[in-house]
Every structure is written in C-alpha cells, then in structure tokens.
Amino acid sequence: MSTIAKDQTQINDKIRAKELRLIGQDGEQIGVKSKREALKMAERVDLDLVVVAPNAKPPVARIMDYGKFKFEQQKKEKEMKKKQKIINVKEIRLSPTIEEHDFQTKLKNGRKFLTKGDKCKVSIRFRGRAITHKEIGQRVLEKYADECKDIATVEQKPKMDGRQMFIMLAPTAEK
C-alpha cells in the first residue's frame, strides 16, 4: 500500500469530523452520531473507528478491526498486481535481401517470443538505393507473417516509417 493512502485513512482519534454517519461491525446502519459517541461504541467492542468515505456529508465511519481491514486491502492489491500482465514488444530486424537460412533463424527467434506471450515487431531497414524497391521488403514481411500465422495474428500491416518498414505480430489468444 502506498504511503499516501496510509496517511489519508482516518482512524480513532485522528478523525477530524465532529459528526459521523456510523456503520456497525456487521454492516448495519446505526445513524449519525458525534465523534465521541462513536469512539465510545467502538471501544466497548474493542474495535477501531475507521472513516471509509471521508468526502460524504457527514463522513461515513465504520466500526471494524483496522489491522484486518489493512491486511484485506493489501491482499486485494496483490491480487490485482498478479492479474496484470506485462506485454513486452520484441523487435526482430531483417534486411530486404535476407538469405533463407538467416530468415529461418530470425523466424525461430520470433516464434519463441510469440509463444512466450510477447508481441513481435519485425522491421526491415532499407539502406542506400534499396528504398526504391519497397515491394521486396513488403514481400519478406508478408512471408514472415504467413510463417507465423498459426501462433500469431497481424496487429499492424506492413507500414513505412522513414527508411524502415515494419509489421506488428501479436500472439493469438489461448483458448
């Protein structure tokens, strides 16, 4: 949990509001009470008074075990982080006049990236007068995409960017 979120949570004596809309430990609405009354009620059951909605008028406070509440929040954050998937974009560089063996080697590397779940940017850099024959580069990229069509989909068709032409491949969704 970030330090900002910790500092913003108002508990027990750190509550600044004079009146609070109080919710009991089992979730029932108790009503609007003064801060002093709410604190006494929380102390009677050996729990904390925690403000859960500070922007409401009056602020909403709940009688609960703050340690348990904090632990549950941290657990939820960890679950959210686990569900997030980081997608890397790996780049493979080819030339318009690439030989077959070199092409197969680059293809093998690209397939490895795609099976791991990474996206793959296949680019061709045109040097010198080779830029006049863009169709050769486009054929190489289309051949690459065709060889990977069983494990990848074309996310972006061949496109020129300065002296480079590239294609984006994304792994197909697993069933």
Swiss-Prot record:
Name the record gives this protein: Translation initiation factor IF-3
Q: Is the keyword Cytoplasm assigned to this protein?
A: yes
**Signal peptide: which range, if any?**
none
Give the record's GO biological process terms. ribosome disassembly
Extract one GO molecular function annotation from the record: ribosome binding
**Which family does this protein fall into?**
Belongs to the IF-3 family.
Its Gene Ontology cellular component terms are: cytosol
Provide the assembly information.
Answer: Monomer.
Q: Which UniProt keywords apply?
A: Cytoplasm, Initiation factor, Protein biosynthesis
Keyword Glycoprotein on entry: no
What the entry lists under PROSITE patterns is as follows: IF3
What NCBIfam families has UniProt attached to this entry? infC
Job of this protein: IF-3 binds to the 30S ribosomal subunit and shifts the equilibrium between 70S ribosomes and their 50S and 30S subunits in favor of the free subunits, thus enhancing the availability of 30S subunits on which protein synthesis initiation begins.
Location in or out of the cell: Cytoplasm
Which Gene3D superfamilies has this protein been placed in?
Translation initiation factor 3 (IF-3), C-terminal domain, Translation initiation factor 3 (IF-3), N-terminal domain
Pfam families to which the protein is assigned, alphabetical: IF3_C (PF00707), IF3_N (PF05198)
